[in-house]
Design a protein with these regions (language model features):
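Sec-dependent N-terminal signal peptides
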Residues: 4-13
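Early extracytoplasmic/domain-onset interaction patches
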Residues: 22-47
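Mature, soluble, non-transmembrane domains
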Residues: 96-204
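A short beta-turn/strand-edge loop motif at beta-sheet boundaries
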Residues: 38, 85, 128-132
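Sec/Tat signal peptide C-region and signal peptidase I cleavage site
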Residues: 15-20
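Structured domain cores in non-transmembrane regions
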Residues: 51-127
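Intrinsically disordered, low-complexity terminal tails/loops enriched in metal-binding residues
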Residues: 29-35, 62, 66-67, 190-202
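Short, hydrophobic/aromatic beta-strand segments
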Residues: 41, 54-58, 131-137
Length: 204
């Protein structure tokens, strides 16, 4: 098996947990969506590393043009994305309503940009915003550390322009969660997932 496609095979087969150090590297961007009552959900964008990108193109870019057609995207969704429902798409959302881990997502697509494959999908998450501030914490991580998931350096969270709602966010480590792993040289290590702490309010 060619090295470039190993990550794709693991994604499709669901073999996380057998390895103690990352095999897939990805950055996340989160875009909040409002409706008339408050928060409607989040668009999630993942940007993958070059090795994973090469595997996706090798296995699923049938015409080898480094662009993904609708039919190719459908196969990617089926064979290299749908299994992630078993990991709740690596998403942990906390608010006063409790913890939410999505069991389904909507509007999946995949595309190439800057030489990297990107996944994009929508996570419905309805939360009313009234007179009091609403706080939502969003974390994206793989507790097995097969995937090393970070955030975009530029604009990791996007808030839509709105005359009704406003908000701000900060990114911080969640010291309550400890992920142990084994480095490539065999030495032990540990890390803490980073979460986006989002505060939303109604302006009128």
């Amino acid at each position: 098996m060619k090295k470039a496609v190993i990550a794709v095979v693991f994604l499709a087969a669901g073999l996380w947990g057998a390895y103690g150090h990352p095999h897939v590297f990805m950055d996340t961007r989160i875009e909040a969506v409002y409706d008339g009552e408050g928060l409607r959900g989040f668009w999630i964008t993942w940007r993958f590393d070059k090795v994973f990108t090469a595997g996706i193109l090798m296995d699923f870019d049938g015409d080898k043009n480094e662009r993904l057609s609708a039919s190719e995207i459908a196969v990617i969704e089926d064979r290299a994305f749908s299994n992630l429902v078993n990991y709740r798409y690596f998403l942990y959302i906390h608010s006063a309503e409790g913890q939410y881990r999505p069991s389904s997502v909507e509007s999946f697509t995949a595309y190439m940009e800057g030489g990297r494959v990107h996944y994009r999908f929508f996570v419905p998450y309805a939360l009313a915003i009234g007179r009091e501030e609403v706080k939502v914490n969003i974390a994206v991580y793989d507790e097995t550390f097969f995937c090393d998931i970070g955030y975009f350096d530029s604009a990791p969270l996007l808030l839509p322009a709105s005359d009704t709602f406003s908000g701000e966010y900060a990114i911080r480590e969640d010291r309550g969660i400890h992920i142990d792993y084994t480095a490539n040289d065999g030495s032990p290590g540990s890390t803490f997932p980073r979460q986006i702490a989002l505060t939303l309010r109604r302006e009128r």
